[in-house]
Design a protein with these regions (language model features):
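Catalytic machinery of carbohydrate-active enzymes
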Residues: 1-187
Length: 187
């Protein structure tokens, strides 16, 4: 794992490394209050929602939006509301998700990282692509399902004690750090 490699570097320069703590993030009161205000329907405080992050920095790490829509529909059948986040420049994926889904989904493309941290800390579950948001969810102790595409899942999986599941399909060309798939074309 990347964290183990970084800790090994510290050990290499002579600093004893006896503990390998997992990632942890604190939630600020300010961020929690801002998210609570944005979530007018009350689902934030009762925590009966799943957080989805259906976007990714690279096409090779992107699970199809339709699959996230089916996930939201399944969660709704279980009585769990779906909230999806993305950045401003990823707003199209949120629009596509809402269009593809047969159930209502609350979306945000304007939250700060502290606000996403607060939101993730209240979620019953996180489902998303391999991304920084997946690491945030894991670091606040939220159970995570992380979908890996081209990147090295052993190296980049969330570093957490929280329940987590890594979902992937094995390809002979993995791991691949590419922005685009050179083996299969469109990912």
């Amino acid at each position: 794992h990347s964290a183990e490699q970084q800790l090994a570097l510290i050990g290499f320069v002579g600093v004893p490394v006896e503990d390998r703590p997992k990632s942890r993030l604190a939630v600020t009161d300010t961020a929690a209050d801002q998210v609570r205000t944005a979530c007018v329907s009350g689902w934030y405080d009762d925590g009966n929602f799943a957080l989805l992050h259906p976007s990714s920095a690279f096409a090779t790490k992107q699970w199809p939006t339709e699959n996230f829509a089916r996930t939201a529909e399944y969660l709704a059948e279980q009585g769990i509301h779906t909230v999806a986040v993305a950045s401003k420049n990823e707003g199209k994926v949120l629009e596509d998700l809402k269009r593809e889904s047969k159930v209502p989904i609350t979306t945000f493309d304007d939250l700060t990282l502290p606000e996403i941290t607060a939101l993730a800390s209240k979620a019953r579950l996180f489902v998303g692509n391999d991304s920084g948001i997946a690491h945030i969810a894991a670091a606040v102790g939220t159970p995570t399902v992380v979908i890996f595409g081209s990147s090295n899942r052993n190296h980049w999986r969330p570093w957490t004690d929280a329940p987590n599941e890594i979902v992937f399909e094995e390809f002979a060309c993995q791991p691949c750090p590419g922005y685009e798939c050179k083996e299969f074309g469109d990912a």
